[in-house]
């Protein structure tokens, strides 16, 4: 594209054109009218910078679209103007005359209504006040509690008067003070009055008897059936029914302020025909003045009182006083602020970056102990192959070895592991092998020339299978323990003279025996590993790339030694192929794995060709195209 970005940018000269070509809906009417098509077309035909043919074509398309929009808007405006002109000058429309061009005042003005504020109020009789108040008035039955009263004489009397006169008529018969039962009945008629008021009630009854004896035969009323008028209204000779009642003695009404000794004086002035009651003779204790005992009913025996209502005070939860908490420390000193600024442990975390390469990421995922001991070196996607691999990871210990291990018959752990690693060795010959090993280990110090070469194969079967410490260290350890002039018993001297022919050479000659380089390859590797460990201890600051280079160099040396050994073996024996099973005979697992890996590296470099007839069978190596070149 031969154009600069500023030409088609948002504020460029051709921005509207480019937008119209690609996003026509984004343009507004104002953008269309602001766009100058003449200058735009000139800038497209003769641009200041070079533009591609495709870009100029897009810009011309935008010009066409903007021109189309302008023509469309112009046509719409013309149509609207034409319609308005046509509606304004349509035929049949007559102009208004001069006098009708202005609207009437009443037609455009709202009428104003002024109310008469001097109007008299309506009459109160016209307003139904009772009906209005009855709406908010409840019935008595709804707002009043029902009173449950016991056996009262009000319901039993049908005569004139609201109160019964049973006790008073009994006193008129003159038998009121003959028995003490009258006092008990009088006290029983009152429900809530205390028994100490019996004396005052008796005095009141006596005063009523004296007052009513004057009107015993005035023939007013029905005799004993006297009512309230008999007691109150007709109580004076001079007054009529509607006159004010005469002033009664103070003994008629019990007042709380009146002391008790006044009643005692009135009791002494009264003389009755019958015997005096014991209450009137004995001195009466002064009764405490209580405002609650005041009553305005003339006859207290006929009055009743409601039972007290049990008022239970609701326990309100006491409001807890809100305690204002004020921070004692109002300012932070400079030491605290400096400590907070210097402490950045809460915002710093350990750096955990992902490995830079996929290979390192895979090593990190599968480099743990749990992965190394449960997964193969290569990823197996098939579950059946993975099961076949994991089945060999947990070998079963033979039953006799397990019993011997539990019974403590094995001398040490190394001996137990040797027996476990070499189950093909007959159990009957183990004692003889121990004796032979003792015979072999001791004369190595004195005659290492012939005896060591003859017994190397047997020591490989027993010692290297369990991965014991290297022979030079064992020799040094035994040399330190043995005296410079060892005393050899005669039995051991006889065993030393046994020729090596008596050892069981039942196995066929091995390739490692023909070529000592293949046999000494693991020992050389051990020595190199020791040297490498010493170098690693001295150089702890090497990078991971250097470690990988050292590992690759080590594998290259091991592969070179394996290749030279195979070349010499094929040259000496004249064979066309070498068996891996034959090569790994009498070696431990680590040595066999190293040889197998060397085979794979040589196969990758096309030095040898590997064939295998079936899974888990022997691998045959034949010379490859680069067998003699590398």
UniProtKB/Swiss-Prot annotation:
One of its GO terms (cellular component) is chromosome, centromeric region. Residues 271-285 have a biased composition (Low complexity). Gene3D superfamilies: Structural maintenance of chromosome 1. Chain E. Pfam families: Rad21_Rec8, Rad21_Rec8_N. Residues 451-460 have a biased composition (Polar residues). Cleaved by separase/ESPL1 at the onset of anaphase; this cleavage is required for sister chromatid separation and cytokinesis. Cleaved by caspase-3/CASP3 or caspase-7/CASP7 at the beginning of apoptosis. Residues 258-285, 423-488, 516-557 are annotated as: Disordered. Residues 126-282 are annotated as: Required for interaction with SMARCA5. Residues 154-171 are annotated as: Interaction with NIPBL. Residues 423-440, 521-531 have a biased composition (Basic and acidic residues). Residues 532-550 have a biased composition (Acidic residues). Keywords: Apoptosis, Cell cycle, Cell division, Centromere, Chromosome, Chromosome partition, Cytoplasm, Cytoskeleton, Developmental protein, DNA damage, DNA repair, Isopeptide bond, Mitosis, Nucleus, Phosphoprotein, Ubl conjugation. GO terms for biological process: apoptotic process; cell division; chromatin looping; chromosome segregation; negative regulation of G2/M transition of mitotic cell cycle; negative regulation of mitotic metaphase/anaphase transition; positive regulation of sister chromatid cohesion; protein localization to chromatin. Residues 362-403 are annotated as: Interaction with STAG1. There is a cross-link at residues 48, 216, 418 (Glycyl lysine isopeptide (Lys-Gly) (interchain with G-Cter in SUMO2)). The modification Phosphoserine is found at residues 46, 153, 175, 249, 454, 544. The keyword Transport does not apply. Residues 287-403 are annotated as: Interaction with WAPL and PDS5B. The C-terminal part associates with the ATPase head of SMC1A, while the N-terminal part binds to the ATPase head of SMC3. Component of the cohesin complex, which consists of an SMC1A/B and SMC3 heterodimer core and 2 non-Smc subunits RAD21 and STAG1/SA1, STAG2/SA2 or STAG3/SA3. Interacts (via C-terminus) with SMC1A and (via N-terminus) with SMC3; these interactions are direct. The cohesin complex interacts with NUMA1. The cohesin complex also interacts with CDCA5, PDS5A and PDS5B; this interaction might regulate the ability of the cohesin complex to mediate sister chromatid cohesion. The interaction with PDS5B is direct and is stimulated by STAG1/SA1. PANTHER family: DOUBLE-STRAND-BREAK REPAIR PROTEIN RAD21 HOMOLOG, SCC1 / RAD21 FAMILY MEMBER. This is Double-strand-break repair protein rad21 homolog.
